[in-house]
């Protein structure tokens, strides 16, 4: 089961939100998603990820990404925050960046083999072919790729 919502604020960015059930525990889903450097393994849009800084607990605090677009690629960095008690990961690009990219992934316990994923993505620019393929609802496309990755992994 999935539900999706996309809406425009008074000005950009475009926010899209989606929720879906996953066939793994919330803790497992959180840990897999929180491993940001592994994002290229499950998100085809992302070509590479490199840890630039770490939090004291060892988790990545800043990750540099390269994403493929229709006619080239774009590099960007995201700052990550983690809340292991709430099973929530948030990210935001640098304020000096030419684009806005931020979001949140939250995982809610349903059972030992199921969880609910709540995902929000804020972007201020279309992301090429991916945006077209997802009918402008990029969050749904990202969550579908993550769910498929979990299915293969677990």
Label the predicted regions.
Residues 3, 64-68, 120-124:
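Generic short beta-strand segments
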Residues 40, 51-95, 145-153:
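Glycine-rich portal/gate segments that line the openings of hydrophobic small-molecule binding cavities
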Residues 28-33, 39, 63, 80, ...:
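Hydrophobic pocket/interface hotspot
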Residues 15-17, 62, 73-77, 99-104:
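Short, surface-exposed coil-to-beta transition loops
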Residues 92-148:
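Beta-strand/loop substructures that line and gate deep hydrophobic ligand-binding cavities in soluble
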Residues 1-58:
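Hydrophobic ligand-binding cavity/cleft-lining segments
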Residues 25, 56-58, 85, 110-114:
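Short strand-connecting beta-turns/loops that link adjacent beta-strands
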Residues 19-23, 50, 81, 106-108, ...:
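Generic structural detector for well-ordered beta-strands
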């Amino acid at each position: 089961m999935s539900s999706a919502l996309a809406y425009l604020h008074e000005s950009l960015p475009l926010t899209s939100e989606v929720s879906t059930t996953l066939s793994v525990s919330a803790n497992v889903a959180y840990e897999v998603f929180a491993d940001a450097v592994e994002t290229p393994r499950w998100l085809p849009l992302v070509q590479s990820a490199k840890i630039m800084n770490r939090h004291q607990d060892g988790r990545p605090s800043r990750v540099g990404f390269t994403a493929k677009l229709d006619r080239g690629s774009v590099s960007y960095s995201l700052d990550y925050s983690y809340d292991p008690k709430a099973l929530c990961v948030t990210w935001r690009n640098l304020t000096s960046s030419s684009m806005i990219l931020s979001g949140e992934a939250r995982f809610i316990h349903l059972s030992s083999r199921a969880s609910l994923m709540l995902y929000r993505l804020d972007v201020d620019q279309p992301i090429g072919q991916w945006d077209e393929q997802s009918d402008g609802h990029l969050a749904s496309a990202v969550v579908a790729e993550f769910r498929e990755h979990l299915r293969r992994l677990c």
